[in-house]
């Protein structure tokens, strides 16, 4: 283990969480990291509660800028690296894949959803991601749910 890049943030193929989060906004990067490491270090429910707090703060502050990508970095770069990172998630943690992809999408995409309606990342997080994480916390014996 390297203290700068601990094992609970790495995959067996060598990808690290920061390969996905480096261009994300602060709250969303923190939420992604806590969901990713949940069950890999310490108390899973506690990590998920921290992720929920960061997501709720992000939803509550629409005035804060979303991910800002430097010139030459495409919006699809983070999600494609994210997809590769998520391929390495072990079978017992597959429940994480959808919330992690939703966090990436909500932070990095603006435009239309597949149904032609405007895409709203905050609605996605509020209606799908947060309930899913709170349900998982409740399943672990936490109080959320």
Predicted regions mapped to residue ranges:
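Intrinsically disordered, low-complexity regulatory regions
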Residues: 1-145
């Amino acid at each position: 283990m390297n203290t700068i890049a601990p094992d609970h943030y790495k995959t067996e193929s060598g990808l690290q969480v920061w390969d996905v989060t480096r261009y994300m906004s602060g709250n969303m990067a923190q939420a992604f990291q806590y969901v990713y490491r949940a069950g890999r270090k310490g108390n899973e429910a506690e990590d998920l509660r921290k992720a929920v707090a960061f997501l709720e703060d992000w939803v509550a502050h629409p005035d804060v800028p979303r991910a800002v990508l430097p010139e030459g970095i495409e919006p699809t770069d983070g999600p494609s690296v994210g997809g590769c990172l998520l391929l390495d998630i072990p079978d017992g943690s597959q429940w994480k894949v959808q919330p992690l992809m939703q966090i990436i999408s909500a932070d990095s995409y603006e435009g239309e959803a597949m149904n032609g309606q405007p895409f709203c990342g905050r609605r996605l997080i509020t209606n799908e991601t947060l309930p899913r994480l709170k349900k998982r916390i409740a399943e672990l014996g936490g109080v959320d749910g």
